[in-house]
Amino acid sequence: MALLQLERISAQYPGSPEPVLSDISLTLGPQQLLVALGPSGSGKTSLLNLIAGFVEPSAGRITLDNVPVKGPSAERGVVFQDDALLPWQDVLANVAFGLELAGVAKDKREQRAREMLALVDLSGFEHRRIWQLSGGQKQRVGLARALAADPRVLLMDEPFGALDAFTREQMQELLLQVWQRTAKPVFLITHDIEEAVFLATDLILLAPNPGQIVERLHLDFGQRYAAGESARAIKSDPRFIETREHVLAKVFSQRSAVQRQERA
C-alpha cells in the first residue's frame, strides 16, 4: 500500500521557459527506502521540495495517505544537507524544537528527544553546543530532530554530501540501522552513485532538461546490511559492482547528452 503517491507531476518555476520536472509518477510505501539519483539539472531537489510541500506542482497531484499535500507538515520530516541547527541552543533543545513549536509539554518533548538521540547514538551529548559537534554529529542531530515528531515519511536532501568519505560511510550505515528500527519510509536524494546503490530498496534515475524518470531499479543491498551482512562484503559483491557500474554508465550517458545539447 502506497503512503505517498505522485501522479504525473510537473514543475515549472515562474519566468522559466522550460519545466524543471515533467510527468513524474512514483509511490513510496511502508519500509521502502527510495533514492533519487541523477546529474545536475535533473530536478532531484525540486522533487523533494514538492514532496515536502515547500513548492506546489504546476501539474499533477501529490498525496500522503490519500490526502493532498498542501504546504509543509510534521508528517513529512526533512533532513537537509546544511544541518540548519540552532547554534544558540544545546543538542537536546535542537532535537525538541519542533515538538516545542507544536505545544508538547517540556517533560514529554525532552523525553522524546532523549529517545531519538539514543537512536542515533548520541546519548550523553544532550547539553553539548552545536559548535562543539563534528559534521557527522550535526547530521545525527538533524536526523534525530526530524524523527522526534514521528513523521509518516522521512525526506533527506543529500544529507551526507558535505561529509568526508569515512564519516559518510558511517552515516549511511547508521541510516540503515535507524530505518530498520523505525520502519519509516524514506525518500533520499543524492549525487553519489555508490551511496544510492547501497542504501536504496528502490532507485530512480532522473534525466535532466526536464527532469524525468528514465529507469527504476529494485535493490536489496541495504536490506542485506540491515540483516547483519557487513558493508565491506556487500560492496565487494560482484552483483553490487555490476549494479554500480550500470548506474554509473546511465548517469554518464545522461550527462553527455546534456553536454551535446549545450554545444549544439
Swiss-Prot record:
Broad class of where this protein is predominantly found: membrane
Taxonomic classification: Bacteria, Pseudomonadati, Pseudomonadota, Gammaproteobacteria, Pseudomonadales
Subunit structure: The complex is composed of two ATP-binding proteins (TauB), two transmembrane proteins (TauC) and a solute-binding protein (TauA).
Keyword hit for Nucleotide-binding: yes
Lineage top rank: taxon: Bacteria
Entry membrane topology: Peripheral membrane protein
Entries under NCBIfam families matching the protein: PRK11248.1 (NF008421)
Enzyme class per UniProt: translocase
Protein name as catalogued: Taurine import ATP-binding protein TauB
An MF annotation (GO) of this entry: ABC-type taurine transporter transporter activity
EC number: 7.6.2.7
Localization in the cell: Cell inner membrane
ABC transporter domain boundaries: 4-233
Gene: tauB
Similarity remark: Belongs to the ABC transporter superfamily. Taurine importer (TC 3.A.1.17.1) family.
Record's catalysed reaction(s): taurine(out) + ATP + H2O = taurine(in) + ADP + phosphate + H(+)
Positions annotated to bind ATP: G38, P39, S40, G41, S42, G43, K44, T45
Function of the protein: Part of the ABC transporter complex TauABC involved in taurine import. Responsible for energy coupling to the transport system.
Gene source species: Pseudomonas fluorescens (strain Pf0-1)
Assigned keywords, A-Z: ATP-binding, Cell inner membrane, Cell membrane, Membrane, Nucleotide-binding, Translocase, Transport
Xref: Pfam families: ABC_tran
InterPro entries referenced in this protein's UniProt entry, alphabetically: AAA+_ATPase, ABC_transporter-like_ATP-bd, ABC_transporter-like_CS, ABC_transporter_ATP-bind, P-loop_NTPase
